[in-house]
From Swiss-Prot:
GO biological process: cytoplasmic translation
Organism from which the protein derives: Nanoarchaeum equitans (strain Kin4-M)
KW Ribosomal protein (keyword) present: yes
Lineage: Archaea, Nanobdellota, Candidatus Nanoarchaeia, Nanoarchaeales, Nanoarchaeaceae
InterPro entries reported in the protein's UniProt record: Ribosomal_uL6-like (IPR000702), Ribosomal_uL6-like_a/b-dom_sf (IPR036789), Ribosomal_uL6_a/b-dom (IPR020040), Ribosomal_uL6_arc (IPR019907)
Protein name: Large ribosomal subunit protein uL6
Function: This protein binds to the 23S rRNA, and is important in its secondary structure. It is located near the subunit interface in the base of the L7/L12 stalk, and near the tRNA binding site of the peptidyltransferase center.
GO cellular component: cytosolic large ribosomal subunit
Oligomeric and partner information: Part of the 50S ribosomal subunit.
């Protein structure tokens, strides 16, 4: 069944600038800039009077799902340029002390499960994503921060996956060594 009109208005905050040209929506704010391509022949996106307007006529379920997805992406863009998304990963080891370094765009994990050869993982999007390694007394944390939620999530998952593939050979109840994501874009995963 077709829906005659679907129209959403998303308000733009005061300290955020938005422009839409050539199917690319650019959002810039005090903490950064994010851009994303939005194009569909049946969905119209426009920026008017401090509002982003999404509308479509005679939409099927597919267009309804797509317009709701676009609305979520735009809200994340508006939120990210004001308060960047933060992902926190913890370096855990029980058997062998593991060391983590960041050199350029490469993450180097040394002494993982006592192996001599280090694990080297190239990280994308480091021009738009900040990666910091914080070392306390006994704990090491990796903090990934970006106004773009998708790119921050990709980098955090690549860091987590860099030590995960070796767990196929080990019993995970006994070998908990690795880099584990515990804080994800404003939500503590351990409390859920």
């Amino acid at each position: 069944m077709r829906i005659p009109i679907i129209k959403y208005e998303i308000p733009i905050p005061e300290n955020v600038k938005v422009s839409y040209e050539n199917n690319i929506l650019k959002v810039s704010g005090p903490k950064g800039e994010v851009e994303r391509k939005f194009y569909h022949p049946l969905i119209k996106l426009s920026v008017n009077d401090n509002k982003i307007i999404l509308e479509t006529y005679f939409a099927t379920r597919r267009e309804k799902r797509l317009i709701n997805t676009w609305r979520s992406h735009i809200k994340n863009m508006l939120e990210g340029v004001q308060n960047p998304f933060v992902y926190r990963l913890k370096v855990c080891y029980t058997h062998f002390p593991m060391r983590v370094k960041l050199e350029g765009n490469k993450l180097i994990v040394e002494n993982f499960l006592g192996e001599k050869a280090p694990i080297i993982k190239e990280l994308p999007y480091l021009d738009k994503v900040k990666v910091k390694i914080e070392q306390n007394k006994d704990e090491t944390e990796i903090v990934v921060e970006s106004p773009d939620k998708e790119k921050a999530g990709i980098v955090a998952s690549m860091i987590e996956q860099s030590t995960r593939f070796l767990h196929k050979r080990k019993d995970r109840r006994r070998f908990t060594d690795g880099i584990w994501l515990y804080y994800k874009a404003g939500k503590n995963i351990l409390e859920e």
